[in-house]
């Protein structure tokens, strides 16, 4: 049997407009073998997804495949996918080559049950009765680890968790026993525990079914867990292609090195994350090609400085004991006890509860209550960062929005600067609102697409009566853009769609800073960003905190990011804190089993595990 499933040679895909021609994929050559996984890694815009769509010939206008060949093996017969008719290609898509997309909620049809949608794919490609297709769907749900599959096939997408929806997408992709599976960022939107389960599932299915897989991601930590071979893409080009062990032990290209080091690590304490620009710079040549120049990198230039403590940002030991959090490491207690004993907290939360009613019946009677936040107590001191971490649905975002008074609490109190704001009316609260701001998760959805950047940044200034004139507000907007790394008056008249994801998030940060707040709540502020852009934004947030004395509540499901940003950390589960203390202590010596599970689930570059996986497949 031919071992190579797919051979892509010299593939070039372009997008042509009346003004310019953009080369999205440039002379890409890759191959995928049966039972093996090729990891395709790079930033957004590097050409990963366009490569996948080109393989399936799904690139829509104004894009087109300009040159190259795509050879696919079916039953020991090689066919050229670029020359196949549309009717034959439709049989191959879904039947022989299947694809899993990033966001299952938008990929699944909300008006049909999940079981119906999987059955539909089976009936399209296989000669089966509806009853046989239903039984096959139940078997697939069981194979991908969905509990009670005979009941779950009748559930709609919104009735399932994110992890279960992604498992449905995997079941749909596997429904016709494909030879090749293309997984496009299938775990990016998932919590670390669910992500670990999905990676394990995909790895097992690939081996058990002798199926080839292309796994697309921007996270090399995920690549270490699942890939056999790795192709690193940068601006449409493959800049490095090797087996997974070589990528992590002796990578050659500066872009690969930067991706490896941009991720926050669990081991050690660093003040600053390196970025791509620390490793290389690019020059545009006369012929339109890109020349990459490697920089000489030193520990000093990256400022990866080990810290032995965080001085003024530590937590008063006496206050921790009062709150009931006494499980601390002995070597940390002295540092904590000498910090901030006389200082009052900026934010003080006591027994906060937020319960949502579930109504049923024609009279909408309350049948039960969902306890989203169920009695949390904590303090945040000036200049400090508190990290809230946990899985989706644990109550992190509800806690943050309640502190912003975007949601009213069911009970409990929270003080801001010594003043109880938990029971204030909206008119009473208005003078205080400029003292605390929020940065939302999605930089695409949180900016008004109809307003210019100037209007977006100056809007909160006008609302709070700041600035004598429009010129004053415009000047401050310019200063804020420069502060967040977007200098130049030309940015003011642009609209959000003209910016990249990282630039949009910088605009969101500038807007939050517009009213000179004391507290900023960062609600999954970097989870939608690539690791390299994420590093830039995290560094920016730290710089602003140091310069302006800001206080952060940093909400995330990514424990490594929370550890990098936070002085103190609260681990949430089912609306409660299961662990609270200095972030370094929690990582070094977690007391709760749930915290240990979260730490174990973080994608990790373990060289011995990679070697073991390679040896087991020889």
Kindly give the residue locations of the regions a language model identified.
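Conserved signature/switch motifs of ABC ATPase nucleotide-binding domains
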Residues: 94, 158, 176, 497, ...
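A short, surface-exposed alpha-helical micro-motif characterized by mixed small hydrophobic
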Residues: 223-225, 562-564
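Conserved ABC transporter NBD signature motif
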Residues: 65-79, 412-420
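Short catalytic/signature loops enriched in Gly
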Residues: 2-4, 147-151, 244-347, 358-364, ...
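A short, proline-enriched helix->beta-strand linker immediately N-terminal to the Walker B motif
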Residues: 175-179, 514-518, 534
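ABC ATPase NBD coupling module
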Residues: 77-98, 246-251, 363-367, 421-437, ...
């Amino acid at each position: 049997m031919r071992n190579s499933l797919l051979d892509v040679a010299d593939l070039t895909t372009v997008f042509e407009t009346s003004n310019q021609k953009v080369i999205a994929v440039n002379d890409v050559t890759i191959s995928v073998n049966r039972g093996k996984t090729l990891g395709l890694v790079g930033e957004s815009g590097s050409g990963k997804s366009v490569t996948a769509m080109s393989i399936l010939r799904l690139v829509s206008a104004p894009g087109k495949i300009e040159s190259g060949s795509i050879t696919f093996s079916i039953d020991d017969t090689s066919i050229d996918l670029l020359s196949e008719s549309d009717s034959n290609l439709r049989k191959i898509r879904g039947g022989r080559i299947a694809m899993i997309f990033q966001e299952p909620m938008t990929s699944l049809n909300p008006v049909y049950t999940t079981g119906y949608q999987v059955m539909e794919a089976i009936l399209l490609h296989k000669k089966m009765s509806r009853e046989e297709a239903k039984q096959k769907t139940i078997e697939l749900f069981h194979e991908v680890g969905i509990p009670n599959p005979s009941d779950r096939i009748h559930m709609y997408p919104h009735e399932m968790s994110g992890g279960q929806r992604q498992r449905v997408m995997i079941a749909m992709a596997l429904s016709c026993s494909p030879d090749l599976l293309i997984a496009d960022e299938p775990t990016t939107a998932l919590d670390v525990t669910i992500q670990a389960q999905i990676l394990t599932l995909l790895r097992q299915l690939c081996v058990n079914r002798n199926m080839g897989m292309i796994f697309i991601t921007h996270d090399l930590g995920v690549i270490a867990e699942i890939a056999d071979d790795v192709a690193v893409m940068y601006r449409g080009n493959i800049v490095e292609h090797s087996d997974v062990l070589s990528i992590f032990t002796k990578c050659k290209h500066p872009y690969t090195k930067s991706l490896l080091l941009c991720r926050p690590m669990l081991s050690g304490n660093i003040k600053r994350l390196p970025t791509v620009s620390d490793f290389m710079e690019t020059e545009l040549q006369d012929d339109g090609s890109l020349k990459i120049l490697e920089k000489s990198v030193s520990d000093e230039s990256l400022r990866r400085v080990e810290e032995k403590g965080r001085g003024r940002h530590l937590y008063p030991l006496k206050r921790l004991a009062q709150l009931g959090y006494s499980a601390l490491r002995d070597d940390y207690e002295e540092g904590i006890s000498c910090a901030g004993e006389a200082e009052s907290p900026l934010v003080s939360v006591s027994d906060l509860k937020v319960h949502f009613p579930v109504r049923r019946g024609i009279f909408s009677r309350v049948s039960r209550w969902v306890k989203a936040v169920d009695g949390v107590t904590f303090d945040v001191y000036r200049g400090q960062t508190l990290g809230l971490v946990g899985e989706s649905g644990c109550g992190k975002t509800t806690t943050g929005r309640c502190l912003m008074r975007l949601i009213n609490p069911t009970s409990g109190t929270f003080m801001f600067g010594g003043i109880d704001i938990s029971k204030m009316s909206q008119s009473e609260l208005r003078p205080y609102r400029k003292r605390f701001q929020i940065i939302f998760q999605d930089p695409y959805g949180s900016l008004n697409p109809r307003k210019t950047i100037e209007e977006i940044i100056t809007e909160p200034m006008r609302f709070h009566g700041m600035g004598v004139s429009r010129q004053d507000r415009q000047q401050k907007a310019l200063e804020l853009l420069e502060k967040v790394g977007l200098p130049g008056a030309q940015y003011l008249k642009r609209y959000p769609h003209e910016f990249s994801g990282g630039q949009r998030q910088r605009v969101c940060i500038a807007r939050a800073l517009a009213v000179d707040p004391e507290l900023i709540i960062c609600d999954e502020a970097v989870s939608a960003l690539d690791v390299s852009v994420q590093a830039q934004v995290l560094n920016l947030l730290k710089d602003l905190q140091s310069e302006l004395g800001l206080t952060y509540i940093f909400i995330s499901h990514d424990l490594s990011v929370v550890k990098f940003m936070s002085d103190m950390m609260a681990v949430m589960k089912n609306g409660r804190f299961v662990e609270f203390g200095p972030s370094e202590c929690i990582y070094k010596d977690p007391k709760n089993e749930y915290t240990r599970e979260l730490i174990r689930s973080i994608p990790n570059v373990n060289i011995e595990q990679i070697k073991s996986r390679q040896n087991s497949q020889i």
